[in-house]
């Protein structure tokens, strides 16, 4: 513990000594995505069931879970009276409904069963003039993960061909229509600024050439890759989640790839998110359509994913 530079000054005070400056340290300490204080006795008493139900889950924020089951389609939260700022919390609770069909979600919203829904595709056009409609960036990136242990995907030219042969602008404007923006990079605009007030994107540059949309260049890379592999065709399975938006993007990618890369066949595998994650973590997939969101306001929340062994 001494080597870690942490000290319990009293029952409610933690003192941390840093080896180097960290501008976002306070944020990290308060972010549930990074550090969570847990009662050791409680965690040990739950054994392997910790955090699998409302009774085996602790909370130190404004709300606590009152109803939750891993397979349930609803999660219910109630106000946490032990929260230090409980007097400032105006809601008695929050209820989350898991609805994969956006049309069903919109109908529930119109019926008064939901207060907030996320829209994509044609539903955006239906509601964009509605005063209740608003758009905001959440910093999430959708991206493709090729399994480089699979034959064909272990070839860099094949991977580059896949990356350059689909139109990101069309995905955002014709498929999603939800305010998403095309990116040829991974750290999004608006995440973090430096000491000069410059956005990270301004300071770091805007794109990686190997990701930019260029069908002719993609075809040349594809031809080169097939030659290196000694093949004239390849077949891959694209794995995606069972939400409307994920399936729509996957279908668009399937069409783009098959139209732009001669000899390529793409099959779609649609799974619930939990199953998709399990298969991808085990390496049982070809190409995965997945996403990542920032845990804190610093480029490293995105960049440290690409360090070997991370």
What are these regions (language model features)?
Residues 1-2, 6-7, 172-173, 207-212, ...:
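Extracytoplasmic/peripheral linker and loop segments enriched in polar/acidic and small residues
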Residues 58, 95-107, 122, 244, ...:
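Short helix-initiation/N-cap motifs at beta->coil->alpha
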């Amino acid at each position: 513990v001494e080597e870690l530079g942490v000290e319990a000054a009293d029952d409610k005070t933690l003192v941390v000594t840093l080896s180097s400056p960290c501008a976002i340290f306070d944020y990290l300490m308060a972010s549930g995505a990074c550090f969570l204080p847990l009662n050791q006795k409680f965690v040990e008493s739950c054994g392997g069931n910790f955090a699998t139900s409302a009774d085996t889950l602790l909370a130190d924020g404004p709300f606590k879970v009152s109803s939750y089951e891993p397979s349930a389609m609803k999660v219910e939260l109630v106000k946490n009276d032990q929260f230090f700022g409980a007097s400032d919390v105006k809601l008695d609770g929050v209820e989350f409904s898991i609805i994969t069909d956006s049309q069903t979600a919109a109908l529930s919203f119109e019926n008064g069963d939901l207060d907030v829904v996320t829209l994509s595709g044609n539903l955006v056009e239906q509601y964009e003039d509605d005063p209740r409609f608003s758009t905001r960036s959440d910093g999430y990136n959708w991206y493709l993960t090729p399994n480089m242990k699979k034959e064909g995907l272990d070839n860099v030219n094949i991977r580059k061909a896949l990356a350059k042969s689909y139109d990101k602008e069309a995905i955002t404007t014709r498929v999603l229509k939800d305010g998403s923006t095309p990116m040829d990079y991974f750290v999004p605009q608006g995440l973090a600024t430096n000491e000069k007030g410059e956005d990270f994107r301004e300071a770091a540059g805007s794109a990686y050439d190997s990701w930019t949309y260029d069908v002719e260049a993609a075809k040349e890379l594809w031809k080169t890759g097939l030659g290196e592999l000694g093949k004239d065709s390849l077949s891959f399975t694209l794995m995606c989640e069972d939400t409307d938006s994920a399936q729509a993007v996957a279908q668009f990618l399937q069409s783009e790839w098959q139209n732009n890369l001669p000899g390529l066949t793409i099959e779609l595998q649609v799974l619930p998110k939990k199953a998709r994650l399990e298969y991808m973590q085990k390496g049982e997939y070809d190409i995965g359509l997945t996403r990542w969101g920032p845990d804190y306001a610093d480029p490293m929340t995105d960049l440290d994913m690409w360090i070997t062994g991370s």
